[in-house]
Regions:
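Residue-level signal for inorganic ion chemistry
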Residues: 33, 90, 128, 188, ...
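ATP-dependent adenylation/pyrophosphate-handling site
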Residues: 19, 23-26, 43-70
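Glycine-rich, Lys/Arg-enriched anion-binding loops that position phosphate/diphosphate groups
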Residues: 151-250
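Phosphate/ribose-recognition catalytic cores of enzymes acting on nucleotide-derived substrates
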Residues: 205-318
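Surface-exposed amphipathic alpha-helices with a cationic face
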Residues: 40-48, 148, 152
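N-terminal Rossmann-like or analogous alpha/beta NTP/dinucleotide-binding catalytic cores
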Residues: 65-132, 136-154
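Di-metal (Zn2+ and/or Mg2+/Mn2+) metal-binding site signature of metallo-dependent hydrolases
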Residues: 25-43
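Positively charged, low-complexity intrinsically disordered leader regions
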Residues: 1-25
Length: 318
């Protein structure tokens, strides 16, 4: 998948791919859920029956996150997928081109007319596909009717896809965040079309877990508010190998932490994996994070958590 990083690189893309006709969709794509995949599949169907290539135009960060940048991270809207995971999920859908637009003051104040002129106008679009709730431009003033008029003038086929529903409810990022806040990972999986997971690089920590008998892989997290917090039973993917373990996402109040971290104790695993990217799939919640009076109390609780996690993981197999 070819990535276009911002409007400033659009001219370079056109120099290289100006002859390519494009089937295009636009959105934020946080989580890349089943509703998003329905649109992408429709794009691919058109692409397979023509010579056109597929392109997803997406914004980062989410608008709600942008408008709360002055708040503490923990008070900002929760993000389903970090930037890297979003990109990888799009790549897994075999999209030809991804056009990344940074949601900043310039984009936020851009009128719908200028958005069409600067973002869509330079592209050789044959088909434009949007969801039924898509809005664009300053104050979300741009809508389907505006795109319809422009598309007609350019000879572009415009499609508005109907709502994609599961159990008579519209699939949305809001619903997914709701399931994650409840640790309802089975419903999350149904809405995403895949298990919920994080992927990140293992970095050096303070080795506290090792000192109390439970060594952890500390995974770097972007500075975003995460939709889940607490202690969980998890599955871990390292290269082509699969493992089981227990994970904590939180600020580690017992040792005076203030920023969110992801720590994973991998069962029956002793290799050094610093610098490796690993994937952590969340199976079931064990408990909320809490502050303990002593490290000894923390150690005893982790031992209980490990037993609970092993039971949960065994139940999940049956």
């Amino acid at each position: 998948m070819y990535l276009i990083r911002g409007l400033k690189n659009l001219s370079l893309f056109n120099e290289r791919f100006s002859e390519e006709q494009l089937v295009v969709t636009i959105g934020n794509f946080d989580g890349l859920h089943q509703g998003h995949k329905k649109i992408i599949q429709e794009m691919k169907n058109i692409s397979q029956n023509s010579s056109a290539k597929t392109m997803v135009i997406f914004t980062e960060p989410h608008a709600k996150e942008f408008f709360s940048m002055d708040k503490n991270i923990m008070d900002q809207p929760a993000r389903i997928s970090p930037w890297r995971d979003k990109f990888k999920n799009l790549e897994n859908e075999n999209i030809d081109f991804a056009f990344f637009l940074k949601f900043n003051k310039s984009l936020q104040t851009m009128s719908p007319e200028i958005f069409i002129e600067k973002v869509l106008g330079p592209l050789n679009i044959s088909n434009l596909m949007i969801g039924d709730d898509f809005r664009f431009g300053q104050d979300r003033k741009g809508d389907f009717l505006m795109l319809k008029d422009w598309s007609k003038s350019q000879g572009i086929s415009l499609s508005k896809l109907p709502t994609f529903s599961i159990d008579n409810r519209r699939v949305s990022s809001t619903w997914i965040r709701e399931t994650l806040s409840l640790s309802d990972f089975s419903t999350t999986k149904k809405l995403l079309g895949r298990p919920y997971s994080f992927e990140g690089k293992v970095v050096h920590g303070n080795r506290l877990g090792r000192s109390i008998g439970f060594p952890t892989a500390n995974i770097w997290l972007p500075k975003n508010n995460l939709p889940i917090k607490g202690v969980f039973s998890v599955k871990i993917s390292i290269d082509v190998s699969e493992f089981e373990g227990i994970a904590n996402i939180g600020i580690r109040p017992t040792v005076g932490g203030t920023s969110p971290v992801l720590e994973v104790n991998i069962f029956d695993f002793k290799k050094e994996i610093y610098g490796k990217r690993i994937k952590v799939e969340f199976v079931k919640k064990i408990r909320d994070e809490k502050k303990f009076d002593s490290l000894d109390d923390l150690k005893k609780q982790i031992a209980k958590d490990v037993n609970t996690a092993k039971e949960q993981l065994l139940d999940e197999k049956n």
